[in-house]
């Protein structure tokens, strides 16, 4: 009789289809995948769901900017997201889209059910709305007058809307959180939700909009579309066959409640306040745990296109490989605090942890086995006391990894596994196989040492599978080792004595030269900037800032007519020595070349300006700046933050063309 396996239902937040996900977004799916794979290895019947969130005002606006329908827009982005999830070797069981017909039908039924039972009522909304976050806020919730979640401006919104009676369920939710300490993790997230939202008192939630149309219509009042979060959150139940009429699927009855909702810390409020209250209203059990993971930051800031610091998964994979990227994002992210990714840190980890600690260990062990015994690995029983310590470390690692994974401390679990590999490297130093090989009388001892190394690496590789699955396969193939069951991973000595390792060991991870990597990174960044510039008309149109200047003294047309403005072409540019601000330009204006000195060194690299068409005041009296003659002025614009950009003609114009 087949053993009944315990179920484990894990979800990620569904990715918002406003654009291509960067590595910070991608971290979540890799983290969830490592947990799902580990649970499968432990014997759980795992169902792992992810997908895309495809409705909302932001998407409607982006589609309009792109000149296509919202459905065409989300089809393109959802396909790209799925491609990246697959590129990262994630083992999801279902990829749901909120534009799926069965999901939309259930959302309409859920809305109607909540309305019929009095949890939703019709009213009038007037307040503040953040379009990127699809969220409403009161004045008191804003931070410096802006959205508390993303920091962008909010806009006044006034429209007829349906509301959900959040306050009706708030006491019940507070009691639930207090009696289920494991529900919101880490604990700091729980404290934030209780102190900032629940205990001060919940306001009723606006759950429909009439100011845009890209959403799921309210079935009995189709001028309203369902609030995107009511739509998106229900994917966790609609994706596994929930039906609010009482005809839910066998799969739903088996899987719900979810064991883990894995989400970013920025959307913890929606998942630990709105979502559980919706479930209470539907008379459904709450998920067992919601884990709000930290952000993966680029350098010292959150990744965003507007900051120009975006790192994409496919660029990382092209440079380092899938498993190296998986290793980095899983190992470098703390349990609670934000992690940091930089190209330099990636190279450092690749060289120290992957190429040296792991890759060199495997390569040395296989090479010594081939050199001394033709690749044959034999257990001789010629043991010494130092072996006991190695075996103790190796056989204890499984339990240590399991304990860390139970707490979702994935980075710590990987540290335990790499601790095993480090212990193997230390064992080589302790036993000195090269010295044993010089003494024929110590042949049996040498064989035992190499057997212990192969066995230890095999166990470590099997434990590594949830995090770096391709690397596990490569190691086991080179060792000619069978994949072990989870139950066997604390047993030492199962490698078949007499097996032969490969006689052609492959380097698992090449050492990288930081200079070469950064040259490739520069190419990537140049391409990104070019792509962003080309797509600038399709990017989200942020509310443009305006700057009011103190008016200067009026001038007459005659005064203005004295100034001559022409188009110039920059043909060379050099920094001015001993100056922190100045660049010296050679600018072609008509048939002449003028030298112009400008204080924009902080905003442009000299090489980036060559070939630019710029606007030049050409009849300004020449003057010396830092000892260099300047024969004109380059026209620039400056924003409120002091950022400066050169003014350039909208269309291609010849050098010397008059600006009038």
Describe these PLM feature segments.
Residues 2-50, 102-106, 156-371, 413-417:
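Structured secondary-structure scaffolds
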Residues 538-660:
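Phosphate-backbone binding interfaces of nucleic-acid-interacting proteins
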Residues 289-292, 476-478, 584:
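Beta-strand segments within the central parallel beta-sheet cores of soluble alpha/beta enzyme folds
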Residues 117-170, 174:
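Cys/His-rich short segments
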Residues 472-559:
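Intrinsic disorder at enzyme termini
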Residues 78-93:
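A glycine-rich helix N-cap at a beta->alpha junction
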Residues 122, 345-383, 393-501, 617:
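Helix-rich, typically C-terminal accessory recognition domains appended to large enzymatic cores
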Residues 2-77, 96-111, 116, 133, ...:
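N-terminal catalytic cores of NTP/NDP-binding nucleotidyl/phosphoryl-transfer enzymes
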